[in-house]
């Protein structure tokens, strides 16, 4: 049964990453789950348990992406990006930093996928419009994609991984934020410094802003644009009070997304049917299916082995617990995708004998490792694979070798600094 559970997991994961002939990840994960149920690797009671773990996370994610797609249609992100470039006053380094700051803000509120897949094409079009050559374009593109994941830590909704882990360990919105805001700031500063050091020779000292369009020209519907600020303010308030009124974040985000879609239907700038169709609905099926397959590993005792490793690491204190868990999560995410990794690690943490602050440190370190680790390899997250595909369609080909060489050099120091930020947070506050 152990070998069967491992084979089902590896085959499912391979087809999810490979996606032969455009095979949908939801269908692949569903097939893997059905095989696991038929063979007895998982039971029907596991189906209910897994659904209970992932429903809030996946529906929140879909709602947040829906909101971001509407904002993209009305030119909200393009307007923001043009403002950032204008604020740099023709200084290449300032523009590089400002684009990353924008990416961090977008990632925090609209999830890492929203930041990477929506902002990167806008940045690409903008730097091309400014007349930058391929050597100069590359750093801005990598920075846009990299910052989307490394700064997707501060809020539960900033990354699907965050929501899954917070739900699994019953962590509230404000409690989560209080633990992760400082690590996120550490990650942002480290990301900017490391990316600048890596690309400093390619970033132009100055650039001509004459070809830069007026920010107002990016806005496709001024009325909906103004309304969007109110929608976002209500959304943020909803997130903050959700913990106190005991309402799942998905309900808050879902209601706001529904209202926004209704408002957008009246706009000529927004193709609501296309937006709804473009939302990642397959993530719901994928999450349930993939996590059922992961539960198969738990049922045959694979996660217990990892739990024992974590118990041994926790014996060396908080610093070792955080660093060990963070780097284990990052490594596993880079080779087998962060979605199954975060749950495998969460189960293992629960099965370990770590308690109190040691367990808390591991819980958040797992999130950090699962958020940042995927930047090491192209297969680390589904968003990265899609991001590379979008860039290829737009004429920017980044080979897996180039990505890995860049990713591993940039990610490791940022991961260490971010985990250090978590350690300092837990011992000081």
Swiss-Prot record:
It holds the Pfam family ArsB. The keyword NADP does not apply. The chain crosses the membrane at residues 3-23, 25-45, 50-70, 98-118, 136-156, 179-199, 222-242, 244-264, 275-295, 316-336, 372-392, 408-428. One of its GO terms (biological process) is response to arsenic-containing substance. Keywords: Arsenical resistance, Cell membrane, Membrane, Plasmid, Transmembrane, Transmembrane helix, Transport. GO terms for molecular function: arsenite transmembrane transporter activity. It is a multi-pass membrane protein. InterPro entries: Arsenical_pump_ArsB. It is found in: Cell membrane. One of its GO terms (cellular component) is plasma membrane. Involved in arsenical resistance. Thought to form the channel of an arsenite pump. Belongs to the ArsB family. PANTHER family: TRANSPORTER ARSB-RELATED. This is Arsenical pump membrane protein. It comes from Staphylococcus aureus.
């Amino acid at each position: 049964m152990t070998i069967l559970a491992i084979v089902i997991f590896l085959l499912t994961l391979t087809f999810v990453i490979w996606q032969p002939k455009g095979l949908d990840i939801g269908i692949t994960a569903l097939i893997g789950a059905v095989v696991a149920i038929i063979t007895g690797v998982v039971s029907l009671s596991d189906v209910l348990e897994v659904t209970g773990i992932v429903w809030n996370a996946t529906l929140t994610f879909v709602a947040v992406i829906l909101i971001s797609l509407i904002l993209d249609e009305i030119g909200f992100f393009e307007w923001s990006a043009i403002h950032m470039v204008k604020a740099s006053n023709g200084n290449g380094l300032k523009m590089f930093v400002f684009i990353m700051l924008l990416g961090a803000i977008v990632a925090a509120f609209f999830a890492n996928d929203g930041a990477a897949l929506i902002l990167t094409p806008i940045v690409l079009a903008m730097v091309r419009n400014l007349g930058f050559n391929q050597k100069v374009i590359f750093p801005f593109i990598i920075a846009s994609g990299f910052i989307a994941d490394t700064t997707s830590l501060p809020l539960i909704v900033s990354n699907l991984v965050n929501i899954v882990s917070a739900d699994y360990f019953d962590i509230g919105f404000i409690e989560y934020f209080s633990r992760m805001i400082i690590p996120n700031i550490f990650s942002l500063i480290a990301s900017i410094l490391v990316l600048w050091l890596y690309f400093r020779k390619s970033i132009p000292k100055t650039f001509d802003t004459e070809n830069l369009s007026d920010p107002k020209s990016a806005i496709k519907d001024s009325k909906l644009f103004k309304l969007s600020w109110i929608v976002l303010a209500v959304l943020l308030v909803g997130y903050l009070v959700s913990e106190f009124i005991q309402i799942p974040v998905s309900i808050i985000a879902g209601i706001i997304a529904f209202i926004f879609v209704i408002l957008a239907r009246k706009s000529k700038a927004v193709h609501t049917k296309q937006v709804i169709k473009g939302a990642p609905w397959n993530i719901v099926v994928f999450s349930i299916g993939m996590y059922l397959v992961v539960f198969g590993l738990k049922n045959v005792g694979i996660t217990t082995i990892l739990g024992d490793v974590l118990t041994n690491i926790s014996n060396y204190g908080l610093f070792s617990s955080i660093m060990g868990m963070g780097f284990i999560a990052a490594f596993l995410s880079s080779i087998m995708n962060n979605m199954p990794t975060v749950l495998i690690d969460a189960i293992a943490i629960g099965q370990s004998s770590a308690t109190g602050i040691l367990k808390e440190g591991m819980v958040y370190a797992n999130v950090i490792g699962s958020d940042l680790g995927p930047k090491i390899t192209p297969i680390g997250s589904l968003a990265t694979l899609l991001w590379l595909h979008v860039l290829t369609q737009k004429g920017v080909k980044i080979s897996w070798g180039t990505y890995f060489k860049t990713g591993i050099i940039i990610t490791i120091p940022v991961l260490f600094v971010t985990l250090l930020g978590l350690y300092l947070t837990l011992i000081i506050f």
